[in-house]
């Protein structure tokens, strides 16, 4: 992270991952523990919503967030095609168990395993050391992330093809084969809000799976080949010398997360194919309250939905707000990565204090 020339900088507890910047073992520990927290939140909130679910009322009127996600991918339906929550308890408890596994993994990496992967006795583990200004090291780690993302996309495509997902056009779960039309996929980059075909949705995921796995394999091996060094030369400005740092990579990550969150917010607020009305409620209107926000297009103040809002409203606004702050974090860390010291700004605004 940016130290402004201070070699003895220390970080307080609230500094988050800054304290593990150069300790890859502890970096993994924090991520494993964070994954455990996410799994626990998913499992516990699913059980909470299931305990409040009233089968005599439309799910979309009850202000749920977790149950609609499960229902939209075809989980919880009985053989007659009625959503009863079948299997949801098992899935929620599985998440709770996995949260303990991830938490234990975080503790192992924090207490037992080396704090830096370079100290590991396992040669394969040492490859995942953190050298923030080394593009070969960073591209190796990036490649493995892309492969895992691609496998997740491929798994979702196969789930829709074999098990089936919910199609609001027919009001039932059906098997969906992907439509790998590249012209359609290209067009949907800017016209995704109106997508009304599950085949097109799965086609996009299939394309992403191919692109991410292919790109991941390239990144995982390209940084260590003699061919690349021969064609591009050793580590220089063309390969990012002087550009990469922990702060810069954090800013890149926050920009990507922020963009995805904003896209998800608009998509959830308007699209009724991926986010069916039966589960999420009616599409939202855009409004300016204290800040730009999404508001329900119909009245949900019937005492059923929490705080009188639909699950669509909660989901869209949470993603929008999270995306906004992720962008602010991106700008903050990008400026710091470029060497800007925010203490200078304080001095300029209040010269007498300086």
Curated annotation (Swiss-Prot):
It is a multi-pass membrane protein. SUPFAM superfamilies: Photosystem II antenna protein-like. Its cofactor is divinyl chlorophyll a; divinyl chlorophyll b. Induction: This transcript is too unstable to be able to determine its expression levels. The whole antenna complex is most highly expressed under low light; as the light levels increase antenna complex levels decrease. Thus at least in this strain the amount of antenna complex is controlled mostly at a post-transcriptional level. Transcription decreases upon iron starvation. It is found in: Cellular thylakoid membrane. GO terms for cellular component: photosystem I; photosystem II; plasma membrane-derived thylakoid membrane. Signal peptide: none annotated. The chain crosses the membrane at residues 27-47, 88-108, 140-160, 201-221, 248-268, 315-335. Keywords: Chlorophyll, Chromophore, Membrane, Photosynthesis, Photosystem I, Photosystem II, Thylakoid, Transmembrane, Transmembrane helix. One of its GO terms (biological process) is photosynthetic electron transport chain. InterPro entries: PS_antenna-like (IPR000932), PS_II_antenna-like_sf (IPR036001). The antenna complex functions as a light receptor, it captures and delivers excitation energy to photosystems II and I. The Prochlorales pcb genes are not related to higher plant LHCs. NCBIfam families: PS_antenn_a_b. This low-light-adapted strain contains 8 pcb genes. Belongs to the PsbB/PsbC family. IsiA/Pcb subfamily. This is Divinyl chlorophyll a/b light-harvesting protein PcbF.
């Amino acid at each position: 992270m940016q130290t402004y020339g201070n070699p003895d900088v220390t970080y307080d507890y609230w500094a988050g991952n800054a304290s593990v910047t150069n300790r890859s073992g502890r970096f993994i520990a924090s991520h494993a523990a964070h994954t455990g927290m996410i799994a626990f939140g998913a499992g516990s909130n699913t059980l909470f919503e299931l305990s409040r679910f009233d089968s005599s009322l439309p799910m979309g009127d009850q202000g749920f967030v977790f149950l609609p996600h499960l229902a939209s991918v075809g989980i919880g339906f009985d053989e007659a095609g009625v959503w009863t929550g079948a299997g949801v308890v098992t899935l929620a408890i599985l998440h709770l168990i996995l949260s303990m596994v991830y938490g234990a993994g975080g503790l192992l990496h924090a207490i037992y395993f080396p704090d830096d992967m370079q100290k590991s006795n396992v040669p394969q583990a040492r490859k995942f050391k953190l050298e923030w200004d080394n593009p070969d090291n960073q591209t190796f780690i990036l490649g493995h992330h892309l492969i895992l993302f691609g496998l997740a996309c491929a798994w979702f495509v196969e789930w829709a093809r074999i098990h089936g997902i919910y199609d609001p056009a027919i009001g039932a779960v059906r098997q969906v084969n992907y439509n790998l039309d590249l012209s359609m996929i290209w067009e949907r980059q800017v016209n995704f809000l109106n997508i009304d075909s599950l085949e097109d949705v799965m086609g996009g995921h299939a394309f992403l799976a191919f692109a991410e796995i292919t790109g991941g394999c390239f990144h995982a091996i390209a940084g260590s080949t003699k061919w690349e060094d021969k064609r591009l030369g050793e580590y220089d400005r063309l390969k990012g010398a002087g550009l990469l740092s922990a702060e810069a990579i954090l800013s890149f990550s926050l920009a990507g997360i922020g963009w995805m969150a904003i896209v998800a917010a608009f998509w959830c607020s308007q699209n009724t194919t991926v986010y069916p009305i039966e589960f999420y409620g009616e599409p939202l209107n855009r409004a300016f309250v204290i800040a730009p926000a999404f508001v329900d297009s119909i009245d949900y103040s019937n005492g059923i939905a929490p705080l009188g809002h639909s699950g669509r409203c909660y989901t869209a606004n949470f993603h929008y707000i999270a995306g906004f702050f992720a962008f602010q974090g991106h700008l903050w860390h990008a400026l710091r990565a470029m060497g800007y010291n925010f203490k200078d700004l304080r001095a300029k605004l209040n010269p007498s204090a300086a």
